[in-house]
């Protein structure tokens, strides 16, 4: 992806952002952002969306300032519209079509020609762009609400790519795109000659970025190279951080041993001095003064040691903050294991109400790991719900022989007003409380999280909680049905969930457009949608 070095499009000077509570979300940030492609990563809640809005000029920084040289087009993650909003209005180009219509009717206004400067061919370009994106012909009067979630994303992206903007600000653009939609976006970015800052956890997309920015609460750090290079640099940083922590701990242990020796020696000298003073032929006031000084020396040394200990403890804490926690291993109950050859699921001439195509005859035997593939709208979610009995089939039957659990991207089976512990208790977990707390701690779900309402916890924590609830209930889960589980997770949470799911000993049926996530699950089969029906492939 060749993008030449250019002058800065944005300059950030001591930019900070505060929440309504007065707490600082991030900053101060200092950065020069050139007109090239750049990925933006960071944990959920750190402020990636807020940073994009600051760069777009939609929000103002709490302090500092942003020099904005480039014209921008911003595509938000959430798309808000009124029910009667047309496509032309939604994309901000209604003025073009209104002016063209007036001119065609011979009712043009004085400023129409000026307003249309550079936009005369926009209808043709929009039409070509929409067709290339698989959206059909562009109809300016079509209601935007008639588009699906993935179609809305592609429509917004089409508008951005066809705009006169120098710089694109894209917030999780692949979240609702299927494989074909993602391939289209990757191609558009390959051909884009302007700059772009793209907040994303899509590793395939980030692999195409020549630069990665990582946002933390304290800084915006720049890494040259794509996502693979970023991972390597972060691993080197973590190796250095772990070495620094080990050195700090060793230094504290060595210093404590030295201080103990100094303390013991000081006490011996003080005791010897006191005994010597008692033998001296000196005035009583001198004796009192000398004894006071001898007794004070251990106290003075103790204060010095306390200050040194505080400095060493602070150094360890600072070093520990730079070390990231290892991804957890998900504990599973023995009952979750599925023996090879055991029938898990059998479909007999199954047809779905959503997509009444050729009947599906299929079965899952043993711990099969199956990817459910197909474009948006083909009926993948409908199939999962039909397998669980949440939705009746059009015809045919489904026979489920094991306990199954379903997790969708919204974790709709969770009551967000309840805590993790409350959910586990409702599931009648067989784990004793001590074991339960220990296993939750292994998932980085400590005492500070397990009693809080899920509504105040991040998406990654909620997903780990949901997995704990379905895997640690008394009736062990042997089949997991996962519907885009990583859609709203940051990279760190996605990696953690990958590792946890890789250990699951049962069967699995998963819907995801994240190829890296699917590879990490070590899939055995693929159930793929075709126009003529579903087909099964061994991987």
Q: Which residues make up each language-model segment?
A:
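Conserved beta-strand-loop-alpha-helix hinge in the C-terminal portion
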Residues: 84-85, 89, 215-243, 529-539
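ABC ATPase nucleotide-binding domain signature region
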Residues: 37-38, 50-111, 366-378, 382-435, ...
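Conserved beta-strand
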Residues: 12-15, 24-36, 64, 347-365, ...
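Conserved H-loop
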Residues: 202-208, 229, 515-520
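Catalytic Walker B motif of ABC-type/P-loop ATPase nucleotide-binding domains
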Residues: 168-172, 177, 185, 407, ...
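Coupling and communication elements adjacent to P-loop NTPase active sites across diverse families
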Residues: 2-18, 96-153, 236-354
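Hydrophobic anchor residue at the start of the ABC signature
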Residues: 157, 467, 486, 497
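ABC-family P-loop ATPase nucleotide-binding domains
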Residues: 81-149, 409-478, 487
């Amino acid at each position: 992806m060749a993008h030449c070095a250019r002058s800065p499009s944005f300059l950030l000077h001591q930019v900070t952002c505060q929440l309504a509570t007065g707490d600082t979300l991030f900053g101060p940030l200092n950065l020069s952002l050139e007109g090239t492609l750049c990925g933006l990563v960071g944990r959920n809640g750190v402020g990636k969306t807020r940073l994009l809005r600051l760069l777009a000029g939609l929000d103002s920084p709490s302090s500092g300032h942003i020099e904005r040289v480039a014209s921008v087009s911003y595509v938000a993650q959430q798309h808000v519209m009124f029910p009667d909003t047309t496509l032309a209005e939604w994309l901000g180009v209604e003025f073009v079509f209104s002016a063209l219509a007036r001119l065609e009717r011979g009712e043009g206004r004085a400023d129409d020609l000026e307003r249309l400067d550079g936009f005369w061919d926009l209808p043709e370009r929009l039409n070509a762009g929409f067709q290339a994106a698989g959206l059909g012909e562009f109809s300016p009067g079509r209601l935007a609400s008639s588009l699906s979630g993935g179609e809305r994303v592609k429509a917004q992206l089409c508008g951005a790519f066809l705009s006169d903007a120098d710089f694109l600000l894209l917030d999780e653009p692949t979240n609702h795109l299927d494989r074909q939609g993602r391939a289209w976006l990757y191609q558009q970015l390959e051909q884009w000659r302007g700059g772009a800052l793209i907040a994303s956890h899509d590793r395939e997309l980030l692999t195409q970025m020549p630069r990665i920015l990582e946002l933390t609460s304290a800084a915006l750090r720049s890494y040259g190279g794509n996502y693979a290079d970023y991972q390597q640099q972060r691993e080197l940083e973590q190796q250095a951080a772990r070495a620094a922590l080990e050195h700090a701990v060793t230094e504290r242990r060595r210093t404590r041993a030295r201080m103990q020796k100094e303390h013991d020696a000081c006490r011996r000298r003080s005791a010897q001095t006191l005994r010597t003073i008692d033998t001296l032929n000196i005035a009583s006031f001198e004796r009192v003064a000398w004894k006071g000084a001898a007794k004070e020396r251990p106290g003075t040394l103790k204060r010095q040691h306390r200050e040194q200990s505080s400095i060493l403890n602070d150094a360890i804490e600072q070093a520990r903050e730079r070390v990231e926690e290892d991804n957890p291993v998900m504990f599973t109950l023995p009952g979750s294991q599925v023996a090879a050859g055991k029938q898990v699921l059998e479909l007999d001439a199954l047809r779905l109400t959503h997509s009444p195509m050729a009947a599906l005859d299929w079965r899952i035997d043993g711990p099969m790991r199956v990817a459910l593939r197909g474009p948006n709208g083909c009926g993948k979610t409908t199939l999962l719900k039909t397998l669980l009995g949440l939705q009746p089939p059009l015809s045919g039957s489904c026979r489920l022989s094991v306990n199954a659990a379903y997790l969708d991207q919204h974790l709709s089976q969770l009551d967000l007003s309840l805590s993790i512990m409350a959910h586990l208790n409702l599931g009648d977990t067989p784990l004793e409380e001590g074991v339960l707390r220990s296993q939750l701690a292994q998932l980085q779900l400590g005492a500070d999280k397990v009693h809080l309402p899920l509504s105040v916890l991040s998406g990654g924590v909620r997903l780990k909680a949901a997995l704990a609830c379905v895997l640690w209930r008394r009736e062990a889960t042997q089949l997991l049905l996962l519907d885009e589980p990583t859609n709203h997770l940051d990279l760190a949470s996605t990696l953690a969930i990958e590792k946890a799911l890789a250990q699951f000993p049962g069967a699995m049926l998963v819907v995801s457009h994240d190829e890296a996530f699917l590879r990490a699950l070590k899939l055995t089969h693929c159930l793929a949608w075709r126009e003529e029906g579903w087909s099964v492939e061994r991987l």
